[in-house]
UniProtKB/Swiss-Prot annotation:
It is an enzyme of class 3 (hydrolase). This is Endoribonuclease YSH1. Coiled coil: none annotated. Keywords: Endonuclease, Hydrolase, Metal-binding, mRNA processing, Nuclease, Nucleus, Zinc. Zn(2+) 1 binds at residues 70, 72, 164, 185. The active site is at residue 409. Its EC number is 3.1.27.-. One of its GO terms (cellular component) is mRNA cleavage and polyadenylation specificity factor complex. It holds the Pfam family Lactamase_B_6. One of its GO terms (biological process) is sno(s)RNA 3'-end processing. Zn(2+) 2 binds at residues 74-75, 185, 431. It comes from Eremothecium gossypii (strain ATCC 10895 / CBS 109.51 / FGSC 9923 / NRRL Y-1056). GO terms for molecular function: 5'-3' RNA exonuclease activity; metal ion binding; RNA binding; RNA endonuclease activity.
Length: 771
């Protein structure tokens, strides 16, 4: 594949094998910089390097996770090659039964797989991989349980029952919220020992589904079993031999369950053991022990039989095992299940060449036959077949050939039903020959034609090998607030504080009984949440987790706690300015400009609030204040020192303070405040401050009428006016106003408090001098 940068919002599917063909299944998924490989098989119709997927077309070092759906050779046989002979460095996962069978199956495969395949029939001495490669790769394989989710650097995947063979799994892969379901080979039919394929609980955005049988429909299971047993019974009754080419594991066990039961039920008709059944495979006994071990992972029927009879259902009464043909005495009728299922080589091919000239014999194909294999060729009923030892030698074929598919693959009806239940808007077809796959694509598009042109339109793709499918996904990015910043974001939900301000005319009305909320019986997280204030700015740090694709909004103080891999550095600014004025004048200018002034130390050195350790033992004449909550100003001996945490807002405020300090001694406002002028009011003997307070009180009388009271007595009129207050009472809402400080000191209603502060601001502007 040509190396090109994939857009971060684009998902790419790239088939290295198994696209528009059956065999060498291998698919690449790429999204958000993550790469997943699905399966690593070989093509049963080819040998050596030619049987491998097109690994040279992709840089396997990019693959982080490789998922093996099941143990069949066309899905798993090139895994040791990938792990030991390429630059692959990722992690490999499969289910427990798959790993248990994998080693035995591939040990046998090593013996018959060679690099190269010349037209003359010669075979090279070098294999695709060695037993040492297989052993080393085996130790690196990790197992996964059904329904458990594993997270590898942000790639999450969950295994589900696929129903194809023991241990077969469908994988739902999730990357940055995008879910891809890969079915592998799957079956929705409940057979004698396996569960049918499951429907994942979470929806999928992309479905990668097999299309082995295209639009074909299977016979009912009971009909197939009856036809199978009748054909075999008829053949052996005539003295013939029956060859059933099967894969060593999978459908072979299903057919053995059928035949063992039939032989027990028809023992007399079959000569009470005179017609033997053999299972010929080098791996027979080894792999059958795996089936006997994992009975509890099979369906309820087989588990019940195991519990009730206390005997393992895979210990057969009427079936014997053959390791090789040297142990087989070929006298009279018999039934032979032999591997491999494609008749390319091995025991099944040897028996085919031995039995095919006899017209009494029967070859019964029970699985799917791949193009280019002897099994597929035999279904054409040729007059002769080539010998495996010498292709120039032709062997006459007179035996009967029948096909009864027990392949654990979905037919069109089952596939369509599954696709509809998954409901994925994007479907990618794999594991199917071009013609059946093309017919399936047309049938699916026709089925979903009513959705074309809508937001729910279903798109179906059937790419060839090494042809990429790019899909655009623009997901919504949601940041999760974590830590202390949550408190800032939550609206005030206290009912009293949220109660709107009532008009004075309604103050005497009786309070209505409070109704219980309709969702009082619900959990807090299920209740309807109060609306959050709009246009409210929340400051924090947005942290993106590249591994898990999570976005977290945290405050600076929480950064280390919630993201231990991040370090923080706080930059403090300090600036010194010489001033030639009194501290009181500086404080007055700061109050006029900013209002929000926290006095830490006054001019006499007395602490007004809790003083930090470094601020104790202050000198007389020192002034220490905090402006806007962040900027600390210390004035000692006509030297002003500012300290603040560096950020955009604090920098701007600090610049404003410096400007005030540099101009405070020459400001007209400073001159006026420092001089002792006559009162500007018309009431001799009354201070200017008291006059201003009374003017502002008039505004309160206009706004609140009798609900407002100015707390002013004769002693206050002649005092220094440092603590003149007023009160506002409206129904159950009340507020205390300190006119000396121009602030609301005590209020139980936010709306009322806001209104009073607004009136105070207007009053301050009205009584302020024009200069």
């Amino acid at each position: 594949m040509t190396e090109e940068k994939l857009d971060t919002n684009s998902f790419r599917f790239f088939g290295l094998g198994g696209s528009n063909e059956v065999g060498r299944s291998c698919h690449i998924l790429q999204y958000k910089g993550k790469t997943v490989m699905l399966d690593a098989g070989v093509h049963p119709a080819h040998q050596g390097i030619a049987s491998l997927p097109f690994y040279d077309e992709f840089d396997l070092s990019q693959v982080e996770v490789l998922l093996i759906s099941h143990f069949h050779l066309d899905h798993a046989a090139s895994l040791p090659y990938v792990m030991q002979r390429t630059n692959f460095q990722g992690r490999v996962f499969m289910t427990h039964p798959t790993k248990a069978i994998y080693r035995w199956l591939l040990s046998d495969f090593v013996k018959v797989t060679n690099i190269g395949n010349d037209n003359a029939g010669g075979v090279s001495d070098e294999n695709l991989y060695t037993d040492e490669d297989l052993a080393e790769s085996f130790d690196r394989i990790e197992t996964v349980d059904y329904h458990s989710t594993i997270d590898v650097n942000g790639i999450k995947f969950t295994a589900y029952h696929a129903g194809h063979v023991l241990g077969a799994a469908m994988f739902q892969v999730e990357i940055a919220g995008l879910r891809i379901l890969f079915t592998g080979d799957y079956s929705r039919e409940l057979d004698r020992h396996l569960n049918s394929a499951e429907i994942p609980t979470l929806p999928s955005d992309i479905l990668i589904v097999e299309s082995t049988f295209g639009t074909a429909t299977h016979e009912p299971r009971t009909s197939k079993e009856k036809k199978l047993t009748q054909l075999i019974h008829t053949t052996v009754s005539k003295g013939g031999r029956v060859l059933l080419p099967v894969f060593a594991l999978g459908r072979a066990q299903e057919i053995m369950l059928i035949l063992d039961e039939y032989w027990s039920q028809h023992a007399e008709q079959l000569g009470n053991g005179q017609v033997p059944i053999f299972y010929a495979s080098n791996l027979a006994r080894k792999c059958m022990s795996v089936f006997q071990t994992y009975v509890n992972m099979m369906n309820d029927k087989i588990r019940k039989k195991f519990r009730d009879s206390q005997t393992n259902p895979f210990i057969f009464k009427n079936i014997s095992y053959l390791k090789n043909l040297d142990e087989f005495q070929d006298f009279g009728p018999s039934v032979m299940l032999a591997s491999p299922g494609m008749l390319q080589n091995g025991l099944s091919r040897d028996l085919l060449e031995k039995w095919c000239p006899d017209e009494k014999n029967l070859v019964l194909i029970t699985g799917y036959s791949v193009e280019g294999t002897m099994a597929k060729f035999l279904m054409l009923e040729p007059e002769t077949i080539p010998s495996i030892n010498n292709s120039d030698v032709s062997i006459p074929r007179r035996c009967q050939v029948e096909e009864i598919s027990f392949a654990a693959h979905v037919d069109f009806r089952e596939n369509l039903e599954f696709v509809e239940k998954i409901g994925a808007p994007n479907i990618i077809l794999v594991h199917g020959e071009s013609n059946p796959m093309g017919r399936l694509k047309s049938a699916l598009l026709s089925n979903f034609s009513s959705l074309k042109g809508t937001e729910d339109e279903v798109r179906v793709y059937n790419p060839r090998n090494c042809v990429a499918v790019d899909l655009e996904f623009k997901g919504v990015k949601i940041a999760k607030a974590v830590g202390n910043i949550v408190d800032e974001m939550l609206p005030v939900v206290d009912e009293d504080k949220e109660r709107p301000y009532n008009d004075p005319e309604d103050a005497t009305s009786e309070e209505q009984p409070k109704e219980e909320p309709q969702d009082a019986d619900k959990l807090p997280e299920e209740r309807e949440q109060p609306e959050v204030e709009e246009e409210r700015v929340i400051s924090g740090i947005l942290v993106s987790d590249e591994k898990n694709f999570d976005l977290n909004l945290v405050s600076l103080s929480d950064l280390r706690e919630h993201h231990t891999d991040l370090s923080t550095t706080v930059l403090k600014e300090r600036q010194t300015v010489h001033v030639d004025c009194r501290n009181e004048l500086i404080f007055w200018h700061l109050c006029q400009m900013f209002g929000d002034i926290e006095v830490l130390v006054d001019e006499e050195g007395a602490t007004l609030t809790k003083v930090e350790e470094d601020e104790k033992n202050t000198k007389p004449g020192q002034l220490v204040v905090r402006v806007m909550g962040d900027i600390k100003l210390s004035v000692v001996d006509h030297v002003a020192t500012l300290e603040w945490t560096q950020n955009v807002i604090s920098d701007a405020v600090a610049d404003s303070i410096v400007a005030i300090l540099l101009s405070v001694d020459s400001s007209p406002a400073s001159v006026k405040r420092s001089s002792h002028s006559c009162n500007s009011n018309d009431h001799p003997g009354e201070s200017e401050t008291l006059w201003k307070i009374k003017q502002i009180a008039k505004l309160f009388n206009e706004q609140f009428g009798d609900s407002f009271t100015l707390l002013l007595d004769k002693e206050s009129e002649h005092s220094d006016n440092e603590n003149i207050k007023g009160s506002v009472t409206i129904g159950k809402n009340y507020a205390t106003v300190n006119f000396s400080k121009m602030a609301v000191e005590d209020c139980n209603s936010n709306p009322l408090k806001g209104r009073i502060e607004s009136i105070l601001g207007i009053g301050a502007d009205l009584v302020a001098p024009l200069c």
